[in-house]
């Protein structure tokens, strides 16, 4: 046996006893014979092979084979009683730690249940060549076509003898890049003196081509860029990769490794990220609600390009809780507009919510019978003034000459016939049906919010209280709609309402167009309910089953029960078809109330022929609106007070209603008899205090009239008209 002259004394002693260990090992043909011999010993009785395996891994070497620490032992263990195993102290501990580290580093995942033969091979030496050699051989036995013949075993023993003599030349390990199934790993290469030619008969497949020189391993070719959406490579064990490098011939060259050694080979490349999808950023398209897309006005692009200095205010035409409304002229175009000033004095949270709602809703509603919002402007002030004071916001609307309340109160200027009233009311229903169809509630229908221009075109305005309606799925406030136009369900505290509330208000306006007076002008909610009950009947469970669910029903107590008498009250002043539509719009139960769309299909509306309707004769020199009407009433009242006559004082009391017609005192005195004659028969008790009591009349039913009263009665031929005026005009 050749021993390298450069080896140490310890190496020579160990290698000298190597032959004896090989001869002793050849007596056992398989690992099973070791187990059978071990079972004869008393120290291995009743221990299973797996348990013994795990127990041997944590016990000292001299206890695994019944070695004696003093150096004595059987013939099989005589070769292990070498100086390297008898020596105590630091050298022995270092060798034991080195053996445990080498076993853990080179142990394959399937070595946990290996035989004793492989364990003795691991403990036979501590040099790097033996450790690497045994690791490669064990893998070749597992994965190659290695038989159990004695010839193969003898060759393996000769190979171990030959490799032990070259321990000095195998001190350094080189990185061997190996590729298997697309996975690039790094394995420890065999020593330079390792010759694989004697092992070629052990493989069933043809021999692989010779390995490339060492320089190629040190400078591998650059890694190609990974293809997008590539399949992640499978996980490959490092020991199997080292074996596969000798058996697979069609392996591509490996990419360079950043870190050498076995520890870096277990690191897999991160999963390739897919390329970023090129999404086209599209702007959201804002359309009207519920699929009713309409074209925006052509001047919407000119918003926010002007301020208040571009307008000249002419006169104030309205005022309310929201602010003031002014008539103005655009200095650039000469067009008349209406500037609605948004009041900010009492706002603690900035811009009022009612103005925000009106702006949002009006920008979604585009109809010929709805007023058009044109722009929003602010005061032309500097930044320093803006810090000290609040800027005024103005909503710019198209200017409409009149409102309906101003036209109704100017009887000497405007007079409507039945066809003209039907034409105006049809336009009102068309605008209201459009609002409801787009999913909104107006919640403030009244005469002052209905505008009419000089061409006779009607437009709905003031959508500050409008809200989006969600099919009665949520609660809304019942403190909406002016009291005179408020439906009974809101008066009783209903908070789950729908478009029927606007239909009731529109029905009140239908009667007001013919009578020129509000139908129900109560002073409070209970008084308003009492007036409604006198004309529309008392609400009860029979005609309104959901009445008991309302909050105000338990606290509302009527003085008496009234019958419904709408047709009797209005048949003599309205067409029969119009009375039928009014009756359906003033239904107490909101579930049975007609809708705006259904009202457009009513026979009275459908019978209208626009070719036969005469155009409205509206005043061209005077704009009739609510504020102008109030000024006229105030001046007339001051003029009557200046006269100082006793009759004028009575006339003022008789016309104390804000929209009652002014009548001379003689006319009022003359009509006292007829009006008081029917006072208890009709339900106009809210005017009774304005009429002087008459002591010569009996309680109802009235007695037969005397000759004088009969003569006076004959002098007034239109008796039904006189009766109606006593109810609604006094």
From Swiss-Prot:
It is found in: Nucleus. The active site is at residue 444. SMART domains: S_TKc. Residues 194-203 have a biased composition (Low complexity). GO terms for molecular function: ATP binding; cyclin binding; cyclin-dependent protein serine/threonine kinase activity; protein serine kinase activity; RNA polymerase II CTD heptapeptide repeat kinase activity. SUPFAM superfamilies: Protein kinase-like (PK-like) (SSF56112). One of its GO terms (cellular component) is cyclin/CDK positive transcription elongation factor complex. It comes from the Eukaryota. One of its GO terms (biological process) is nematode larval development. Residues 313-605 form the Protein kinase domain. The keyword Nucleotide-binding applies. CDD domains: STKc_CDK12 (cd07864). It is an enzyme of class 2 (transferase). ATP binds at residues 317-325, 340, 398-403, 625. Its EC number is 2.7.11.22, 2.7.11.23. Residues 1-230, 246-283, 623-730 are annotated as: Disordered. Residues 9-21, 75-94 have a biased composition (Basic and acidic residues). Keywords: ATP-binding, Kinase, Nucleotide-binding, Nucleus, Serine/threonine-protein kinase, Transferase. Gene3D superfamilies: Phosphorylase Kinase, domain 1, Transferase(Phosphotransferase) domain 1. Residues 204-230 have a biased composition (Pro residues). Residues 57-67, 714-730 have a biased composition (Polar residues). Cyclin-dependent kinase which displays CTD kinase activity: hyperphosphorylates 'Ser-2' in the C-terminal heptapeptide repeat domain (CTD) of the largest RNA polymerase II subunit, thereby acting as a key regulator of transcription elongation. Required for normal reproduction. Belongs to the protein kinase superfamily. CMGC Ser/Thr protein kinase family. CDC2/CDKX subfamily. This is Cyclin-dependent kinase 12. It comes from Caenorhabditis elegans. The lineage of its organism: Eukaryota, Metazoa, Ecdysozoa, Nematoda, Chromadorea. The gene is cdk-12.
